[in-house]
Amino acid sequence: MTKNLLVELGLEELPAYVVTPSEKQLGEKMAAFLKENRLSFEAIQTFSTPRRLAVRVTGLSDKQSDLTEDFKGPAKKIALDSDGNFTKAAQGFVRGKGLTVEDIEFREIKGEEYVYVTKEEVGQSVEAIVPGVVDVLKSLTFPVSMHWAGNSFEYIRPVHTLTVLLDEQEFDLDFLDIKGSRVSRGHRFLGKETKIQSALSYEEDLRKQFVIADPCEREQMIVDQIKEIEAKHGVRIEIDADLLNEVLNLVEYPTAFMGSFDAKYLEVPEEVLVTSMKEHQRYFVVRDQDGKLLPNFISVRNGNAERLKNVIKGNEKVLVARLEDGEFFWREDQKLVISDLVEKLNNVTFHEKIGSLREHMIRTGQITVLLAEKAGLSVDETVDLARAAAIYKFDLLTGMVGEFDELQGIMGEKYTLLAGETPAVAAAIREHYMPTSAEGELPESKVGAVLAIADKLDTILSFFSVGLIPSGSNDPYALRRATQGVVRILDAFGWHIAMDELIDSLYALKFDSLTYENKAEVMDFIKARVDKMMGSTPKDIKEAVLAGSNFVVADMLEAASALVEVSKEEDFKPSVESLSRAFNLAEKAEGVATVDSALFENDQEKALAEAVETLILSGPASQQLKQLFALSPVIDAFFENTMVMAEDQAVRQNRLAILSQLTKKAAKFACFNQINTK
């Protein structure tokens, strides 16, 4: 006999961008939980709205499958003494399995007999396993979490309700100080609290309270409503996939409607209007059958059609305020002089440790000269490139880009064309930002491609030079995206430019504003984007291995595979954190990392130093990883009993030297502080 399980977590409004990933994660972790507990099922369906995450398991087995396991013990010659009695080795083996020597049998393997015992575990009822779903909810991970009401725990948002039902049976489980019940919350304004009658009645019980729990159904409702508006008004509505996904995660009961604005605003560049509608107001764009932008928009309210006219007027009023700004900036920006704006970039900080935007542009210009030759640009292309490099950031000081920063580069192209620059120069200014995402559009022109590469390379090298290097999951200056952009552009244009030779050439350049440093780190960083051979290996593990000092591809692949293999084991997180802490502190070591045993003040220092001195990574990657993880207790004991940053400089440097020697050896496998254990 099978059953149906429902788990729903009611929360404060979730950020739209975390709803879908969290729903998916809940389904995956529930499936893993059931598999781990030997519970078969027919299907898993997940649900989500801005205020809830839920999962339903149908066709769930009413009990665990029985488990039969065979365990191999010592050889017979060790298990029996000369009198044929079981030795302590045999007795200890069976005792550890919860059995007795009477359960022992002997099996022959390759000519020798060994002790074997068979252990049978009768499966528990599903009711006994269900309380474990609380651990599934606790295991969910989020980009950010928060505390509330003075509690010590944290979660993505405050939790209000927990419903766990096995068919009609209610489980009053505890989760983050919330007592489970069959009560769920309806729509914030249109609905009320309701009791979920059974696992199978979930959607209908909520539907009565103006909540569409199935995101696929909400999406289809939005699409159908938009199509209906299209047919009614004879227009074309752009259903942007990303915008649709965001909107459906902002509403529990969607109702689409069309609003309008004064046609005079259509004189403003289309990109300004589209940005105002899509990016700022979450509106869908409306066009005529020929693709021409119309003075209309589509929005989706979180509710039904009651008082919809008031809602439309409110949305129109908000949009007009945005469009007024756009119209004003478009008119006023045309009075500006490009050369004046470029000069003012001397007063705009690129980064406080790096200098001004103008200095960044000058360095980029010098890089373009080097790249133009390597890329084989024509004389005309080289001239256009030089002009574009001289002015390409000017639009950052325009009013339009100040208000709508998404339009940087786009407005630069429009303003340069109005100023009489060549189309190639104008296009390059727009294209130098490309790609803006991992799979984003690439430049089409050679001039734009070279400018994009040069701009990104100076950005990468400049930040690395002042020590602003990404670590773990932290990349505040989007250097990974910039590096990936460089690699993608080079590949797309078929330019056979050796990256190591190119970087060497760049480090040979001399600038008044900055000296490039940290070349080895830059090479590692770029190589991480070029080398995609690690496939679906988690990103942080890729980076850890590629940041190491061993550049043999076969070794890197094997190391990544070994890390993935053990990443779910219990000792992975504490072991990596121990090594990561050592890596982070070792960066503070000064000069040559030599260790003086005369400066040791405790046994833990001595133990770690000796362990590091005798550490020789050998064998396959899995064996090397075991060697490194075996150091975790020694490292932890060192940190627990040793103040690394001691006041005595000699003692401090000696302790840092121990860590430096450790990390130098460990880096031959991977830089463990690049692995995210959070």
UniProtKB/Swiss-Prot annotation:
The keyword Cytoplasm applies. Transmembrane segments: none annotated. It comes from the Bacteria. InterPro entries: DALR_anticod-bd (IPR008909), Gly-tRNA-synth_bsu (IPR015944), Gly-tRNA-synth_heterodimer (IPR006194). It catalyses: tRNA(Gly) + glycine + ATP = glycyl-tRNA(Gly) + AMP + diphosphate. PROSITE patterns: AA_TRNA_LIGASE_II_GLYAB. Its EC number is 6.1.1.14. One of its GO terms (molecular function) is glycine-tRNA ligase activity. Belongs to the class-II aminoacyl-tRNA synthetase family. Tetramer of two alpha and two beta subunits. This is Glycine--tRNA ligase beta subunit.
